[in-house]
Amino acid sequence: MRATLFSFQEAALADLHEKIQKAHTLWSEKDPQVISFTAPTGAGKTIIMTALFEDIIFGHAYGIAEPDSIFVWLSDMPELNEQTRLKIESKSDKFRARDIHIIDSNYDSEYFAPGGIYFLNTQKLGTDKLLTQKSDLRQYTIWETLANTAKRQPKSFYIVIDEAHRGTATPQAENRAQSIMQKFIKGSKEDGMPIMPLVIGVTATPQRFQRLVADTTSTIQKVAVPP
């Protein structure tokens, strides 16, 4: 990391590692895992998550390196993903630009490549969008890519739902984004999308993320930075 974490950020990072290890121990297809990571605005959530990604991929005091791990960062606006991507690139001294990918409408792969961070936004995931439809030019939908990767490596595939930097949108647009985000938490039979094995929700207000995970069958663990 190019940035030095404050003590409260280090404490949150250690807690995230502990909860992830616990989630991996508890995980089964019938018991998917969710971690709710809450921190107030300005607490450096993206910096903490960048340190977490580095630790998992490159090794850390809490465990050995897992270089095949994959992270998918989901938000509701492409501009927010771009801001987060730039922050990760500026704060990390280990990830290179080639390791960080913005998923566009042309993306088509059976699996996500190991060792990468992938940014995805809900605006590209509607039923009428190219990423979600098969065609003569597309072999795999994004739902199939997610499902295949989760099945192949359930304990090294991380979905990060960015609730902390939600864009300003109409109620209708916000409801659509929430419905799409819930597919990662609850699965979607019509899309062939299973429940993702481990979802980390990054939020400034726990109530907002709680609405996303309401009625889920997942085990929910909590990490919180005090205000």
Segments predicted by a language model, with ranges:
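Signature of the SF2 helicase/ATPase Hel1-core->accessory helical subdomain module
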Residues: 49-55, 86, 119-227
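Walker A/P-loop
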Residues: 27-52
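Flexible phosphate/Mg2+-sensing switch loops adjacent to catalytic phosphate-binding sites
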Residues: 22-32, 58-71, 92-105, 175-176, ...
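Conserved Walker A/P-loop ATP-binding site and its immediately adjacent core
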Residues: 46-51, 62-96, 121-127
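Conserved H-loop
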Residues: 42, 76, 204-205
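Conserved motor-coupling elements within RecA-like helicase/translocase cores
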Residues: 106-118
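Short loop/turn elements that form and flank the Walker-type P-loop nucleotide-binding site
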Residues: 31, 67-68, 112-113, 152-155, ...
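N-terminal pre-P-loop "Q-motif" helix
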Residues: 3-31, 121
